[in-house]
Regions:
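Glycine-rich Rossmann-fold phosphate-binding loop(s) that bind the pyrophosphate
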Residues: 143-144
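An N-terminal-biased, well-structured beta-alpha scaffold segment characteristic
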Residues: 1-78, 211-213, 217, 223, ...
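Rossmann-like adenosine-cofactor binding region
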Residues: 39-44, 166-259, 274
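NAD(P)-dependent dehydrogenase/reductase Rossmann-like domain
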Residues: 263, 271-387
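Phosphate-binding beta-alpha-beta segment of Rossmann-like dinucleotide-binding domains, i.e.
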Residues: 79-137, 301-303
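N-terminal Rossmann-fold NAD(P) dinucleotide-binding loop
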Residues: 147-148
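Oxidoreductase and adenylate-handling cofactor-binding alpha/beta cores
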Residues: 87-106, 152-159, 285-298, 334-338, ...
């Protein structure tokens, strides 16, 4: 029985994909696999039983990635599973910032008891007049799964779209509309665009990237949209930019005591991925990733170990090894198997930074003594027998 712990509520359509060999009611301490959404794991003690963690979503700043890698715990996320939901919110954010729909709705609520509200509306509506987004310039910082959908949708709405991403993948580039103008210097986004939306992970290099220096380059009346991570925007700097008029509206999906009181900000309660469809997609993708890893040893969409997919094992045995990305480890693994008279039918090895992953299909079952010998190799972190 494989024990699975859910640190947050996970959509039932995902959990039902587990076979009867899985117990999804396990405690965290006994779990071999964990499903998580937003629960903070940095202070949690990770047991020796734990093999994998799957984040039902894209961001993984709530998971201790380095600690997990050191202990041979593979961490997965679900890139793209909630992208359409976030795209929809970004489009809505642009409309909310352009047309004072919130103010108009509040006026109606405040005057709901007025018997002449219909007549009063014709005079009052002038206060809520806005502008269209068609023909305006949108800068998209980050062209991953979400950014590319936002860019393409904005093109369809008649906007002039500029995209910036120094690490854009070939796949993302192929999916991007040819009408998107690719920008090599993010400063040009700040200078040119009326609307700017950011879609990058929270890294040391991106924290506070939308700062005073960025605002100084922008046109007056710029709209900033942040449905990615709260730390990407320097809140003190954007507060000043709102007061000066450099920024017309800041739409944030991350309420806190600062943004909640910020005049000129539209702050939403972290709704970007909160659609039934997105939660279902994330749960299904996360469960499939866990099952593929537990049952086949394959790694797809890991954030701390390299991807390594050899399909379903067709030989008598399969061994997986999490290890340091250092010389001689591979040769020592093959030497141990050779000395035990075990032939390697096929082998895959991939590396990612300081860590590597090896998957070996063998023509005989590996006895416990061989597993112990493999585990004793310097640089080896975790050995697992799939079959």
């Amino acid at each position: 029985m494989i024990n699975v712990n859910c640190l947050n509520n996970i959509a039932a359509c995902g959990l039902k994909l587990f076979s009867d060999e899985y117990n999804t009611e396990s405690s965290f301490e006994d779990a071999q696999a964990v499903l998580v959404r937003s629960a903070k794991m940095h202070d949690m003690e990770l047991s020796d039983n734990l093999l994998a963690i799957a984040r039902a979503g894209a961001g993984v700043n709530n998971i201790p990635l380095d600690k997990c890698a050191e202990e041979g715990i593979v961490v997965f996320n679900t890139p793209g599973a909630n992208a359409n939901a976030v795209k929809g919110q970004v489009i809505a954010a642009m409309l909310l910032a352009s047309r004072d729909l919130i103010g108009g709705n509040k006026w109606v609520a405040d005057n709901a008891e007025d018997p002449d509200i219909a007549k009063a509306t014709e005079k009052a509506k002038k206060a809520f007049a806005g502008q269209e987004i068609k023909g305006k310039k949108l800068g998209v910082i980050g062209l991953g799964a979400i950014g590319q959908l936002v860019a393409n949708a904005a093109i369809a709405l008649g906007m002039e779209v500029y995209g910036y991403d120094p690490y854009v993948s070939v796949k993302a580039a192929w999916n991007l509309s040819s009408e998107v103008k690719y920008i090599s210097d993010v400063k040009d986004i700040y200078k040119e665009c009326n609307y700017i939306t950011v879609h990058v992970p929270a890294l040391d290099s991106t924290k506070g990237m939308i700062n005073k220096e960025a605002f100084d380059l922008m046109q007056d009346g710029t709209v900033i949209i942040n449905c990615a991570r709260d730390v990407l925007v320097d809140e003190a700097a954007i507060g000043e930019a709102l007061k000066s008029g450099r920024v017309k509206t800041y739409v944030s999906d991350f309420p806190n005591p600062t943004t909640a009181k910020m005049e000129g900000a539209i702050v939403l309660p972290h709704l970007g991925a909160s659609t039934a469809e997105a939660e279902d997609n994330c749960a299904i993708m996360a469960v499939n990733e866990l099952r593929n890893f537990i049952e086949n040893g394959n790694i797809v969409n890991s954030v701390n170990y390299p991807n390594c997919d050899c399909g379903v094992c067709a030989t008598k045995g399969r061994i997986t090894v999490c290890h340091k990305n250092v010389p001689t480890v591979i040769s020592k693994i093959t030497t141990v198997l050779g000395a035990a008279g075990i032939n390697i039918s096929s082998m895959a090895n991939q590396s990612r930074g300081d860590y590597a992953y090896s998957l070996l299909d063998i023509e005989a079952s590996a006895p416990e003594a061989v597993v112990e010998e493999l585990s004793a190799i310097e640089g080896v972190i975790k050995v697992r027998v799939i079959k």
